[in-house]
Amino acid sequence: MGNIFGHLFRITTFGESHGGGVGVVIDGCPPRIEISETEIQLELDRRRPGQSKITTPRQESDTCEIISGVFEGKTLGTSIAILVRNKDARSQDYDEMALKYRPSHADATYDAKYGIRNWKGGGRSSARETIGRVAAGAIAKKILQQVAGVEIVAYVKRIKDLEAIINPETVTLEEVESNIVRCPDQDAAQKMIDLIDQTRREKDSIGGVVECVMRNVPKGLGEPVFDKLEADLAKGMMSLPATKGFEIGSGFAGTLLTGSEHNDEFYTDEAGNIRTVTNLSGGIQGGISNGENIIIRVAFKPTATIGKEQQTVTQTGEETTLAAKGRHDPCVLPRAVPMVEAMAALVLCDHLLRHHGQCKTV
């Protein structure tokens, strides 16, 4: 049904934007992992609405409740259920959208597939579905850090045509969180903030690119052929709302190079470890992690729901116009950063457990 992600570390998200709440059930989490609602809340606060002038003004605290699977601050090894209740839905803002399709949104395709849709807030197509992913990602991050020292940092690389200069090898979470757009390049960040604010006033939206670096990833994660590590990362990222592209390492720019230019030559470091001189592979070769930093980029389109009037049709095919009401992000990128980190953590945690189960080397 498309609501389940992962093999051994498996999540099932549930809930709708204007329903009673949203959440996640996590299966396969190892026992005795220390976790608290406070730790999960820190991640949820990074993606919650209403956090700044460049995000949706919907006011939700997104307070998480651990319903099961954790006892006295430690995971039990049983299913973990986490719930976040919706508190600030305004369904009346969507009355017009009950009949009219939003251009480039899921309204028309949900109707085409199911013959029915929840037009209040978009139902399952709303980005509030990602709350469950971010909550589960907080636990996955904890496992990765404890077992292997893995660190995951995502940040806004580009907004429209404004591109930041960022070193993925050294960037820190503190630098990312130092401004409301989550871009560690301070000069570029202010220009991005001004552009998003201007776009919001014009009742329009813009997109961009989130880059993510995964450090200290053990060698050997990933399965041959269909479950290659980059394939699962791509699936995870492309399952996020508004995503339109995925790159790893050199990405499409690598097509402009020759093999001798693109190949990451090997050497042995002072500790006797096999390393690569360059990292155009992005930390993965043959679908398996090679121990170098994994670097990916995810493209997000402009938010589909905008206040600017556009041509559309009704459910019965009558041509009309729509200037959408409601509270929506003029740019999803600042809030997409923790979503990208969460999906990266979920993929890596799942592959870490799978690798340990088969090879016993982590």
Curated annotation (Swiss-Prot):
Its cofactor is FMNH2. Pathway: Metabolic intermediate biosynthesis; chorismate biosynthesis; chorismate from D-erythrose 4-phosphate and phosphoenolpyruvate: step 7/7. It catalyses: 5-O-(1-carboxyvinyl)-3-phosphoshikimate = chorismate + phosphate. Gene3D superfamilies: Chorismate synthase AroC. It comes from the Bacteria. FMN binds at R124, S125, S126, G286, K301, P302, T303, A304, T305, R327. Its EC number is 4.2.3.5. NADP(+) binds at R47. Reduced FMN (FMNH(2)). CDD domains: Chorismate_synthase. This reaction introduces a second double bond into the aromatic ring system. Belongs to the chorismate synthase family. Homotetramer. This is Chorismate synthase. It comes from Gloeothece citriformis (strain PCC 7424) (Cyanothece sp. (strain PCC 7424)). The gene is aroC.
